[in-house]
Amino acid sequence: MNLAARIPHLARFAVALVFAIYLFNPSPTLAQEEPEYPVDPALMKGMKWRNIGPYRGGRAVAVAGVADDIFTYYMGATGGGVWKTTDGGVSWKNVSDGFFKTGSVGAIAVAASDPNVVYVGMGEAPIRGVTTSHGDGVYKSTDAGKTWTHLGLERTRQISRVQIHPKNPDVVYVAAQGNQWTANPERGIYRSTDGGATWELVLHVDEKSGASDLSMDLSNPRILYAAFWEHQRLPWKVVSGGEGGGVYKSTDGGDTWEELTEGLPEVVGKIGVAVSPANPDRVWAMIEADDGGFFRSDDAGKTWTRVNKQRILRARAWYYTHVIADPVDEETVYVLNAQMMKSVDGGRTFKPIPTPHGDNHCLWINPHNNQTMINCNDGGANVSFNGGKTWSTQANQPTAQFYRVITDNRFPYHVYGGQQDNSSVAIASRTDDGGIGREDWYPVGGCESAFPAFDPNDPTLVYAGCYQGIISEYNHATKQSRNIMAYPFLGLGADPATLKYRFNWNAPIVASPHDPTVIFHAGNVLLKSSDRGQHWQEISPDLTRNQAEKHGPGGGPITNEAAGAETYNTIFYVVESPHEAGTIWAGTDDGLVHLTRDGGQTWQDVTPEGIGEALINAIEVSPHDPATAYL
């Protein structure tokens, strides 16, 4: 199977690949046909989902406000749809449930001429790999979020920006970034002049390069600036940069475009662009390039000057690279990265503006008052009425993203998991009080990508992980945590080929159901400890495809990606059979399934035919038949 054909398989993080695998016949009775007992669907109607928390925000990459109402804002979560506040962030309400087919929001825009008109572009633009959900085009509301209509552009997948004509809400532009996994034609700048009923692709560079940003001159909305980005996500690498990148300008509402090059780098990666509402001749661009940095034009894009080359402004460019011009002061501009940075001297120097959470992705500033703004980041959205000196809370947004969840056997039982870009959590499923509050949950070690494991009958000791093979033991009785890494080396920035073990970002940690003092941890091999992590032993060979050509730098050709999420050919799921000690299943991120029935002395490749290089996200052993497992 060629790369283009198998990338879609790798991207389906949550897809259910279900196979019944009959590998052995433990007893004659299991070989006999058993009578079926159909379940009446009516019995399930009384079961309803309820939110148990924790009430702290998850990743968001899109916000917008209503210029004439300083208390009304919209937030787009990367997995939870669109949320709205009408009290300045004191409370939030989901307004997209029941209308949207997908939950990942990439861009939001409110019409300045009619705040009842809201456009939403689906599909988050920061391409995080398997944890990134694609979108299904554009949605529109004409009643301030009460109802929504789907407007098409389903195959654009990731949308980075939506711009609306300031005086005509039927004229709207969409910056389509495109499919992160493979080339596709549905990327570039789309325009509609009839409120989204029809769309025209008015700027298209090639099938590998999409629009990473779009800015409109509000004093003359026929002038547009578009940033293009050649990029691709591979499971083992983020490709950011190429000949298809660049900055483009239109002076006729998108009918024709000119590439702006004078003073800009030749080969570029991701770009953020913004024209100043205070001075339409002032245009900003944050550019990823070997000779990149923060660029300024004072002649409406004809010529450019690099005014700042600090690496902190363009670090991890594929994940950030956002520029927001102050609506009142042409010398004031914001750059969003891990920190929110502000310049008041035309981009020459920047100072950080503290936000409630790091990894900042969006900022909307009220055009009438530059002290009123809403910011979003990996912890949710927050509103400020004093230019970022103080912010509203993120502890009122049930939009967290969890990598894995597991329960114990206490009463009431607790649910454990790792929240993306936040801590691990153990939270009560119910309480004797009026609700589940902050006092009813606590962190249990590890970090955002925790894969918790414990004795379900006595979860005093919790084993939880983090990226690059970090694993800790948390003692809830003493509230202490200790590092028990199998190989205590943090290889940030190192090529996986140079590491002893290749650990997935969400590396499995499993406690044996037969002896909870035994824990398993997986890299490219399966590791076992029988003494609470004091010592580890390898109980398998490399169970992955072990493709050496995929063990190089995590990013390129311009910027390396150092955090470790691109480490590939790893074991992604491990489960020991509840029926037999020593019977262990292991699935990898490259589509292999292995089984041992003797505690790891021998392994059998039991990969079902036809899977290809897919992500084995979960393996469930049947509680009724030890010979059956589901992928």
Where do the language-model regions lie?
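Bacterial N-terminal signal peptides
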Residues: 11-26
